[in-house]
């Protein structure tokens, strides 16, 4: 838009809208009785996620969607978006508890489904996990417990969701966010197993903002889900911050490096700890291979992971 031009009115974003006007004697006369020019970033982002989900599911002829509901904020927001996009009859959530799943996680996942009025079920992965562990026992002889056992839990959940997807004809929505994708805080063929990623381009801090925005319309996400420290619950008393910086430090580093093309030194000059910046940048570069195998999803930022940013997977250069 040139300096001499001005925006007279805006139609609604991410939904069908129309405007009637007359152009007479070099003047525009708007005929609609109710025109708004309200701009709300969170509303626009939320509406974009709803429309993107609705379009992908309906235009690809899926009956509905399945969501692994952990009692955490990512799966809760994904379920709320799916509900707003498709309606309650086409959204199913599944809680898949194990030994490290907190009772309040099970309760909150159930409360979320009840608030939305969607179908919810509980399938324990304990028996499946123990069967896998028994089959692998001889191969793992003499080796201690490590991330392998944590990832196995996630992959049991992935197998469960994909089996239900095949049987029901429902699309599995993954629940990972952009912050996790950036640093590889995910399990291939586990929580990345699915057909569409609603929050693929949404940072963790924005996830919280969107959850609060959705609750401002009507309270569907239990307050405790928003207030609890995030955890993958793959080990006793596990928290995301055991492996990552707080998201209010992590997300700005990711944004500057990925979206703004800032160098390590430029990020450090913004007041961030050098050791932390170098670690985060190293994780972003290293985990390109995971992002290449992740489901496609909705773009809401200037640069998403996917077509906007594709770095070599195999190289010996280190920043």
Describe these PLM feature segments:
Residues 2-71, 75-319:
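ATP/NTP-dependent adenylation/nucleotidyl-transfer catalytic domains that generate, transfer
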């Amino acid at each position: 838009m040139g300096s001499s031009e001005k925006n007279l009115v805006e139609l609604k974003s991410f939904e069908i809208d129309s405007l009637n006007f007359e152009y007479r004697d070099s003047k525009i006369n708007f005929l609609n009785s109710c025109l708004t020019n309200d701009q709300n970033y969170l509303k626009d982002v939320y509406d974009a996620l709803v429309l993107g989900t609705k379009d992908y599911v309906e235009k690809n002829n899926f009956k509905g969607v399945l969501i692994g509901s952990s009692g955490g904020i990512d799966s809760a927001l994904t379920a709320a978006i799916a509900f707003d996009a498709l309606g309650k009859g086409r959204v199913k959530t599944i809680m898949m508890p194990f030994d490290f799943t907190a009772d309040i996680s099970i309760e909150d996942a159930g409360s979320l489904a009840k608030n939305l009025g969607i179908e919810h079920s509980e399938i324990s992965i304990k028996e499946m996990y123990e069967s896998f562990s028994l089959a692998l026992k001889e191969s793992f002889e003499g080796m201690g417990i490590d991330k392998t056992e944590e990832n196995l839990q996630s992959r049991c959940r992935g197998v469960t969701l994909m089996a239900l997807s095949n049987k029901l004809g429902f699309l599995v929505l993954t629940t990972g966010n952009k912050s996790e994708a950036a640093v590889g805080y995910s399990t291939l063929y586990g929580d990345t197993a699915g057909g569409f990623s609603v929050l693929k381009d949404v940072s963790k801090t924005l996830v919280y903002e969107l959850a609060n925005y959705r609750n401002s319309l009507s309270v569907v996400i239990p307050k405790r889900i928003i207030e609890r420290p995030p955890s993958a619950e793959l080990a006793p008393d596990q928290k995301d911050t055991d492996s990552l910086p707080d998201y209010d430090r992590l997300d700005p580093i990711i944004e500057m490096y990925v979206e703004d093309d800032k160098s390590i030194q430029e990020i450090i000059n913004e007041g961030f700890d050098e050791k932390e910046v170098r670690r985060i940048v190293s994780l972003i570069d290293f985990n390109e291979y995971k992002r290449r195998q992740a489901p496609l999803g909705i773009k809401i930022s200037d640069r998403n992971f996917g077509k906007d940013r594709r770095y070599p997977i195999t190289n010996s250069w280190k920043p």
